[in-house]
Amino acid sequence: MALERSDVEKIAHLASLGLNDADLPHITSALNSILGLVDEMQAVNTDGIEPLAHPLEASQRLRADVVTESNNREAYQSIAPAVENGLYLVPKVID
């Protein structure tokens, strides 16, 4: 799947990105390269291959799951500008 300039402009608009007209050919080319790589990876036959979370069979040494900090929720909420029912109230930031 190859992207055209109009596709990149639409994606940029949906993502609220401001792109220069001079940058569009480079960005279109870069996105097409990425999509080409994805197409190559999807073309590989992976039937019978078990998915890996990590290429090496190693176990991680994890620390004990122990509480290390005290609950300061009440103290933090007492200095917050606005709290309701135990939740912090913040101004709307997305249109």
UniProtKB/Swiss-Prot annotation:
It holds the Pfam family GatC. Disulfide bonds: none annotated. InterPro entries: Asp/Glu-ADT_sf_sub_c, GatC. One of its GO terms (molecular function) is glutaminyl-tRNA synthase (glutamine-hydrolyzing) activity. It is an enzyme of class 6 (ligase). It comes from the Bacteria. This is Aspartyl/glutamyl-tRNA(Asn/Gln) amidotransferase subunit C. Its EC number is 6.3.5.-. Belongs to the GatC family. GO terms for biological process: glutaminyl-tRNAGln biosynthesis via transamidation; regulation of translational fidelity; translation. Allows the formation of correctly charged Asn-tRNA(Asn) or Gln-tRNA(Gln) through the transamidation of misacylated Asp-tRNA(Asn) or Glu-tRNA(Gln) in organisms which lack either or both of asparaginyl-tRNA or glutaminyl-tRNA synthetases. The reaction takes place in the presence of glutamine and ATP through an activated phospho-Asp-tRNA(Asn) or phospho-Glu-tRNA(Gln). Keywords: ATP-binding, Ligase, Nucleotide-binding, Protein biosynthesis. It catalyses: L-glutamyl-tRNA(Gln) + L-glutamine + ATP + H2O = L-glutaminyl-tRNA(Gln) + L-glutamate + ADP + phosphate + H(+); L-aspartyl-tRNA(Asn) + L-glutamine + ATP + H2O = L-asparaginyl-tRNA(Asn) + L-glutamate + ADP + phosphate + 2 H(+). HAMAP family: GatC. Heterotrimer of A, B and C subunits.
